[in-house]
């Protein structure tokens, strides 16, 4: 029996196994990356939906000075905090920070509405614009995070 045939067969087998392992590892990483992106996309979507629902509800709220400063209760009822906690589990720190700022800006908007400021008042307009601006910055950060996953 020739040793060269056995060695060539062994080397070919080892190379075949290594190539299969490398291909499986690459496939696993790609699948994991896709799952991570889907998880992050879902968390972002749920948070934005909850935040928008809360802001829309607040814009229709009746003036009630005793509710000023109590927006955290109302925002919790719309699922914003639950969605924000979910986002905190899967997102980068910069995204979580912008989500927190967006939540605070919606709380400020709530306070402007329940304080009785008219929709054309400077306080209302400033709060509405701040909420819109922080939401836009958040969406930009979400897009950046989704591209990097």
Where are these regions (language model features)?
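Conserved non-transmembrane functional hotspots
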Residues: 18, 22-149
């Amino acid at each position: 029996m020739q040793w060269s045939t056995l060695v060539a067969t062994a080397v070919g087998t080892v190379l075949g196994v290594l190539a299969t392992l490398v291909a499986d590892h690459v496939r696993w990483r790609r699948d994991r990356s896709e799952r991570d992106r889907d998880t992050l996309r879902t968390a972002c979507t749920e948070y934005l939906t909850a935040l928008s629902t809360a802001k829309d509800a607040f814009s229709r709220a009746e003036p009630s000075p005793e509710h000023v400063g109590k927006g955290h209760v109302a925002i919790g009822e719309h699922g914003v905090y639950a969605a924000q906690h979910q986002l905190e589990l899967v997102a980068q720190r910069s995204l979580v920070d912008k989500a927190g700022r967006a939540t605070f800006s919606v709380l400020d908007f709530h306070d402007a509405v329940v304080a009785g400021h008219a929709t054309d008042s400077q306080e209302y307009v400033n709060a509405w614009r701040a909420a819109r601006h922080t939401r836009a910055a958040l969406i930009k950060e979400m897009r950046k995070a989704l591209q990097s996953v």
